[in-house]
A protein has these predicted regions:
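Double-stranded beta-helix
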Residues: 21-22, 160-225
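Active-site region of the double-stranded beta-helix
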Residues: 112, 138, 153-164, 170-172
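Short beta-turn/strand-loop junction motif enriched in small, turn-promoting residues
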Residues: 137-139, 156, 221-225
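Juxtamembrane helix-loop transition sites at the ends of transmembrane segments
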Residues: 67, 73, 156, 187-190
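Pocket-edge structural micro-motifs
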Residues: 51-52, 118, 153, 169, ...
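Non-heme Fe(II)-dependent double-stranded beta-helix
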Residues: 1-45, 50-143, 179-180
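Short, conserved beta-strand element in jelly-roll/cupin
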Residues: 135, 142-160, 207-210, 215
Length: 226
């Protein structure tokens, strides 16, 4: 029987898999762009932030591209969170995914052989009232062992005033945590919530300038306010 291809797996597909959901620290001894101290910090805290990827003159046309893509998406009836796997459709997104500084950071954290398998344009519209509850990316991804990371590139300035992402430092050492389906009253962009997440470590706001990036482990608890 021919199987249906899905870029984003269904929750039932993932729940039925046997997976190694432990944090596997970076063992890179000769990093390309990160310092040994940054590697140590990633292993300890589960993330790095304020990594300069693009200069102002480079990020401006990328922002313009995404503004146009967003307008086309909204005009088609989709919402601002629906632009997923865009690297398969748009050369600009592919160029970002394969941008040498981004690939070098991924290799320093994950090892020399990396696959950029996904992309998601995550855009909060002013006043939409949606939050992102505390969650772990590993809950959504069919990867084993758990050696996957997310690189977030800011195409505009992200700070507490516009609900930047927040990480819970060190929470990746807890393994895969129990989650529950999010309630409608949470107005969650996603569909999972880890309760009492603050008990697993310090909350760190990830404020980025346009052109900067962060990287975090797929087991790190993170979310953002409305």
């Amino acid at each position: 029987m021919k199987k249906e291809f899905r870029a984003v797996p269904r929750p039932d597909d993932i729940e039925g898999m046997e997976r190694d959901l432990r944090f596997h620290p970076s063992t890179t001894e000769t990093p390309q762009v990160l310092s040994p101290g940054q590697i140590e910090s990633f292993n300890r805290d589960g993330f790095l932030k304020n990594l300069k990827i693009y200069e102002d003159g480079q990020i401006a046309p990328i922002r313009s591209f995404f503004d146009e893509l967003l307008q086309r998406t909204l005009a088609s009836g989709e919402d601002s969170y629906s632009i997923s796997t865009a690297h398969l459709l748009h050369g600009t997104v592919w160029d970002i995914l394969t941008h040498p500084p981004i690939v070098a950071i991924a290799r320093d954290v994950l090892g020399p052989d990396v696959i950029g398998w996904g992309s998601h344009f995550f855009c909060k519209m002013p006043g939409d009232g949606k939050a992102v509850a505390w969650h772990q990316d590993a809950s959504y991804w069919p990867m084993t062992p758990s050696r996957t990371a997310t690189i977030w590139l800011a195409v505009d300035k992200a700070d507490l005033s516009n609900a930047c992402m927040k990480f819970i430092a060190g929470s990746h050492h807890q393994g895969h945590l129990t989650w529950r389906p999010s309630g409608e009253e949470e107005n969650n962009v996603l569909n999972q919530t880890v309760d009492n997440a603050e008990s697993f470590g310090e909350i760190v706001p990830i404020e980025l300038e346009a052109g900067e990036a962060s990287i975090h482990s797929d087991l790190l608890l993170h979310g953002s306010d409305a």
